[in-house]
Amino acid sequence: MAKEIIFSDEARNKLYEGVKKLNDAVKVTMGPRGRNVLIQKSFGAPSITKDGVSVAKEVELKDSLENMGASLVREVASKTADQAGDGTTTATVLAHAIFKEGLRNITAGANPIEVKRGMDKACEAIVAELKKLSREVKDKKEIAQVATISANSDEKIGNLIADAMEKVGKDGVITVEEAKSINDELNVVEGMQFDRGYLSPYFITNAEKMTVELSSPYILLFDKKITNLKDLLPVLEQIQKTGKPLLIIAEDIEGEALATLVVNKLRGVLNISAVKAPGFGDRRKAMLEDIAILTGGEVISEELGRTLESATIQDLGQASSVIIDKDNTTIVNGAGEKANIDARVNQIKAQIAETTSDYDREKLQERLAKLSGGVAVIKVGAATETEMKEKKDRVDDALSATKAAVEEGIVIGGGAALIKAKAKIKLDLQGDEAIGAAIVERALRAPLRQIAENAGFDAGVVVNSVENAKDENTGFDAAKGEYVNMLESGIIDPVKVERVALLNAVSVASMLLTTEATISEIKEDKPTMPDMSGMGGMGGMGGMM
């Protein structure tokens, strides 16, 4: 297929048109008075969203060059969402403002490479200043404030997330699911839960709830299949003498071994239950080791020279209780030593920092949560499916923003932190580098300007008032239309969100500004079918018979 090559200002202007169209669609969602965007779906009902990245992902432009520009900024929104969980609209608005201002200067003759260098230096200085302006999240109230702002000023969602974080801790896992009713709920699972249920319903102790409930059980951990009960007999005899229940966690328990355990359970010889070990392969071994550390036991592993026959009661873990249903096993208050659990937690945190795979990171974080806190499930309820999706998006955003705030701290919100950081930096740059730095500094007004515009206020007046305010915590509350102390009013943003949004915006804008040529496919119009209306139908061919 033939390709079209376009150079210099013409190429950059085309790319800018695409960026502008994407920005125009995304920017309307910004701030407490931002509007919704209605998105047509290829099937089913249209979706309504106020989530910047959801809007950006749907933008596909007809012109291939414009679409290239839009797709680069769309990538910025997605990357910002992946890294910080929020700030996608801020990143898009900043990228557009930097590109627009930079394009004007480069068209006027500035050197793109020097301009880029100045932009990078300004970005670095502002990020450093943002970190200085930040402070730690102090209490549950501030967590609720961050979540409320990110959830489009929905206090109920903010409080729900604050409750969840208080219960499972900052390392705990908080998941968001759709509720069966119209009400929002918070369910917290204390202790370690993994997704394996009982191997036989005959183990059930609570027929009403269809669960196995073991009080102060011993826990045997084995990393292979158990097919022969003979290997288990020595440890079973020791358990029987104590009169305590036993939970067996192994790769699998099959045939004769499982049947004999069930018979012993039904006859009342042993209060016993068995489940499969969670995970697969190396992850299964790691999770068994986690359970061993949590319960103060040891994994009986043939790789370490241990056989099931050699297991003693000292190798078994303990917990205050274990609850098993058909899908999940929950171990509450494992008897492991705190020092060993802390060491394991730190080891998993180090692995999270080193891994480059998103999937591995997610699985490691799940393991970390199960060891350190617990799991909270926020169930989001709504009257219609469309509202449910929109609300779930907001809860996901708020949850990510809250985690970012706990991780790196908070700054004043509403776009004011970027303006305050700009006022504090002093750069000694010359020529086109100074122009590059000035481009970034001017663009930092764009988020506040957009928030004010969406709320129906004069953006120039608002930006000027915030820039000239004597108190560095003063910003603009767009919901009320007042200048307030942002910290006292609870209008706060995670510094990570601001930092990541700025870094990604500068990165993509500088790439676009240093583009000198574009290569795109020439779309060829497919020939239309010839008009056959004049042939008079098949009847006119009768003479050929």
UniProtKB/Swiss-Prot annotation:
Source taxon at top rank: Bacteria
Primary location class: cytoplasm
Keyword Isomerase (UniProt): yes
InterPro entries xref list: Chaperonin_Cpn60_CS, Cpn60/GroEL, Cpn60/GroEL/TCP-1, GroEL-like_apical_dom_sf, GROEL-like_equatorial_sf, TCP-1-like_intermed_sf
Catalytic activity: ATP + H2O + a folded polypeptide = ADP + phosphate + an unfolded polypeptide
This protein's UniProt keywords: ATP-binding, Chaperone, Cytoplasm, Isomerase, Nucleotide-binding
Subunit structure: Forms a cylinder of 14 subunits composed of two heptameric rings stacked back-to-back. Interacts with the co-chaperonin GroES.
Function of the protein: Together with its co-chaperonin GroES, plays an essential role in assisting protein folding. The GroEL-GroES system forms a nano-cage that allows encapsulation of the non-native substrate proteins and provides a physical environment optimized to promote and accelerate protein folding.
Family in the record: Belongs to the chaperonin (HSP60) family.
Name of the protein described by the UniProt record: Chaperonin GroEL
Organism: Campylobacter jejuni subsp. jejuni serotype O:2 (strain ATCC 700819 / NCTC 11168)
